[in-house]
Amino acid sequence: NAEYPIEKTMTAMDALRREGKVRYVGVSNFNVDQMRQALAICPIQSLQPRYSLLDRHIEDDILPFCEREGIGILPHSPLAKGLLTGKYRPGHRFPDGDERAGREVFDDENLERLAPKLDALTAIARARGKSLVQLSVNALLRQPAVACVLVGGKNPSQVAEHVGAQGWGLKDEEWSEVERILK
């Protein structure tokens, strides 16, 4: 953001860190070049990027960079704004005011294209006694640089479902099948 240059922002954050007013500094949605600029001024402990099984743009450069630099990743939107819940199918309409209403990713054409993939992923999850949500969160947790996954629950059952994403994992051949489905 040109209004808040990285150098100026990170200099201020480093001053707060040195004064003991903040212990750790994290950034959100930075690319590798931005993190390099920031690291030249101030240590960074975490990055909060958009990351899900359907949006894996960070895997090529950001994920390896953060692992090398010891920066913990705290992914947001791990369920792709609800796409990885399996609830949204062609014909679904969001109410006025919902941020997903009118977004291309939720149009019928995209939902139609995703449906077979989501069904196949759901079948893999169910074979392990898990849900698509749990598989989707677990996939991110298996990345060494991911410190935790930022999920939100509207009710206790959703929170319980999210907790069930940890403490298990697919076999290598199952992950290979997940990769094949997502290609």
Where are these regions (language model features)?
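Beta/alpha (TIM)-barrel catalytic core signal, keyed to glycine-rich beta->alpha loops juxtaposed to Asp/Glu
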Residues: 1-182
